[in-house]
Amino acid sequence: MKLFIFGSTGDLVNRKVLPALQNFNSEKLEIYAIGRKNITQEKYLHHVCSEDRCTPIFQESIKYIKLNFDKEDICGKKCIANFDQNKTNYVYISLPPSQIKKILYSLKKFKELNYSIKILIEKPFGSNLLEAKELKQLIEENNLGKDIFLSDHYLFKQNIINLPKQDFTKLEIKSTEEVGLEGRTTYYNSVGALKDMVQSHFLNITQKISKEELKDKIEILEFKRGQYKNYSKELGKNQ
């Protein structure tokens, strides 16, 4: 089984995705970690497997591939050299919305060459409604609908899965995290915590637990906007 991870140097992949894949415990799993950072295979493994987090077998399953995400055809020869034409290739995309369209454009061309591809896109799906509609149109025009799945990793937390559907007149959601920017300056300067957390995670949770359709029934009484406690300090060192 071949899994291609776009955004492999990101925080989500490092903290959540790779540890989960290691627990999957499949010796037949081949992971192609795709990123824009100009680092060696050794440095990438040191980054994601620090503190002895990875078994030797799991480390051997990972191959780092550097790609130029500014090119129109992101994948090109480097991807196609590793794709399997006889089996399904699995693709996980955890990137800012502006880069997803280019990747879908490349993967569409692989589909035209009869490669079997299944794609999981991590939220956010577009940075605004217009971008989301453009991505949806791109998917529909190129017959990718049956091959693409949209994911919000918050909905797969066990305590969220266990929440029952219910009626409510008021809902308060608190997300308490110990981590800050953690090197995500570029991402947060373009997306921000409001889009990263509220319009995706919080609204998806609200929709999941509501017994009734929420369309036209939500009234926002108050909202508060802030930033990570050490944002300014981390901004300086992560530039």
Please name every model-derived segment:
Residues 1-120, 125-239:
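Secretory/organelle targeting and membrane-embedding segments
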